[in-house]
């Protein structure tokens, strides 16, 4: 086993018990979701990272399948000691619905007919993919995820997750993505679809008992693959080098290495992918649009997750300006967002190739855990005029040991603890001021949890009120939450 490798992994399958309702209003029954999971789910189930794959990806994101000659598609990032560290995190990746790598799609058997769906399969959207993933996580008993990450179409899913389930995710990492599909992106997808449906073997999608439209699918892949590269990468890799010859043939056969490469990519793709799935998934990408009434700011207004938006300098399919548009909209909504550009000549595919930069940027973002990541938001507070008896009752009813005392405008005035209440009972104190700690040690939401932990340890206290810049109480953080998180995310 190579250093940092997961070794042999297996794909698992979850069968939904209920129908899956789609954005179009239609429903799919007997839905299967193929997925893989790496690492160990901790006792509190708060170390989950969901990985979302790109257009033609699958659930096999890392490790090796028996007999394979290469690992999963994001093995450079997933495994022990990598940024998606399986010694810290429980990583889940599933094949999208509409796909052909284990999850229900047009090549699956329609339970009503006993035959492959073909074009009777309903059109799906990125939102439908995300909703299916949510069903899987519910099945796994996961009530929240630490982070969701993906590149290209995976990045679209990340953004959709952030909008659809804002209270469910803590951090969101979108690579080489956009908040809506541009006319150019839609145009490339349409040309690819025409390549498929123009193949006589396509037969209106009814080819499952004959031959797949391999010529059309290969051509679609060739078109797509050009958009994944960059001019620089093609010049570096191929230049104008000839393939197996030292002079032009002066005919219409392949002369150049780049031609041979594209044909190879097209042929090999037909061995692992279904033509109808390509039609459906590219259509889902075309429909993707998170703007609301034309406004991206309005469309992203509900996002609560801390966001990392990553672009690639040489990506012309999802150019950096589209990522910057996302960042500006998030900033306008006061979302905590970080923007990074990967310096690379690989083009769009850099999110699959630039191991060093990606591990550094993503690892730094995931390990930069602050108080706001784990503090309790629904903090119970009281004012100074409350009686000790009432304060004790509130603490008992809510199962808490620390009770911040605030002014009329919610500013911190002090704090009392269960130990203070015990002291008041023993000494027969009747007013809160006899036990109130007024010089309160507090924390800020952007404070690192290790600094917060040292503050608690140095002062021998087990919880801190969290205040904003106006000294208003916005949460509380306890040593138990910190100990759990530090244990799961120890710095490397």
UniProtKB/Swiss-Prot annotation:
Single Gene Ontology MF annotation: homoserine O-acetyltransferase activity
Signal peptide span: none
EC number: 2.3.1.31
Domain AB hydrolase-1: 47-354
Keyword list, A-Z: Acyltransferase, Amino-acid biosynthesis, CBS domain, Cytoplasm, Methionine biosynthesis, Repeat, Transferase
Pathway given in the UniProt record: Amino-acid biosynthesis; L-methionine biosynthesis via de novo pathway; O-acetyl-L-homoserine from L-homoserine: step 1/1
Residue positions binding substrate: 221, 349
Catalytic residues, chain numbering: 152, 315, 348
GO cellular component term of the entry, any: cytoplasm
UniProt function note: Transfers an acetyl group from acetyl-CoA to L-homoserine, forming acetyl-L-homoserine.
Name of the protein: Homoserine O-acetyltransferase
Organism of derivation: Methanosalsum zhilinae (strain DSM 4017 / NBRC 107636 / OCM 62 / WeN5) (Methanohalophilus zhilinae)
